[in-house]
Amino acid sequence: MESTAAPSESPPEAASPYRDPEPFQVTAQGQEMCFFPSGSGRLERLIKLLDEAQTSLKLAFYIYADDGCGGRVRDALVAAARRGVAVSLIVDGFGAGVDDAYFAELKDAGGHFCIFGPKWKSNPFIRNHQKIAIADERVALLGGFNIEEDYFAPPEENGWRDLAFTVEGSLVPRVVEWYGQLEQWTSDPHAPLRNIRRRVRQWDRGLPPVQLLIGGPTGRLSSWAWTVTRDMIHGTKLDMITAYFSPAMLLLRRIRRIAAKGQTTLVLAGKSDNPATIGASRSLYRRLLRSGARIYEFQPCKLHTKLIVLDDAVYLGSANFDVRSLYINLEIVVRIEDRALADRMRAFVAEHIPASLEVTPALYREWATPWKRLRWSLSWFLVTVVDYTVSRKLNLGL
């Protein structure tokens, strides 16, 4: 674990003792939703989903590690396949540390396993960043977590602070439909990249108040990028938690306008396994603070949550708010317009603030020496133009 803040930047008194919130339920626009803020809650809900499936399981994850949690999930998938459940699993060829041999038992039991974009093919920087688990085409588990022990560890062990949610309702058939397209493309070793680009570009996001947005390398704005960009034109109240915050300048300007005419609260990472992502965010703080945005860096552990509340619209899913998640990686995001859900998720954002360090204009001026500003600008370049796997290897002394 590496903390990216020097002692003078995050004194112990700046953050209160933190405990993960308990699971909570919300019904919004006919969708029954349950949220799991704690790592243990996420893991137990995933295992329960796998253990109780009767007809089908459809999963896709970016990172799948060969560790205790990875083994537990694999064993549950094998058991499901052996009792007659149709099991399908997709992992990303770059993010996952497992291969066909790791899932030999699953395949022997009749399960289907495939890898999205194996390493070192053309266009190696495109990732399947989606996190999807669907049971019996009835309930979907979505969010930001991967299959690795770090994503289920508690804050005191510096586990990733993340969020997962189940949904039951009219949204689930749309998730099933998208998974089918993803699986069809991934299962064909000769499928050209333009095929998945076309699928992302032509995806029907549906009509408000409940929409399923898909992001990816379309050559133009995907349904995810187009919708959030449009919403920010007239937005007046923005609350956001995101692990990686380095948007394009157009979106930064729109966030600044929201802050100037209304209210903007950003809870961003104070710790990460990739210091460059924090530096990239800090390179934008000066302009945001000048516009009146409130910025907080979460202190207890690494932050991985992805949540946007913009007026009465709530965005939940796999996407960070950075160039890669907006324009390059495959992402899945649920958008629901519902005032009660928006109010509840704003309260959830607020629960992070006592455990966060507020970056005031005065504190920013203390941090922002010319040398640090140079390193932050370099970090922004690395995480927006290059790849996280490259920037993660560089210690910029942030």
Model-predicted segments: where are they?
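Charged, low-complexity intrinsically disordered terminal segments
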Residues: 1-398
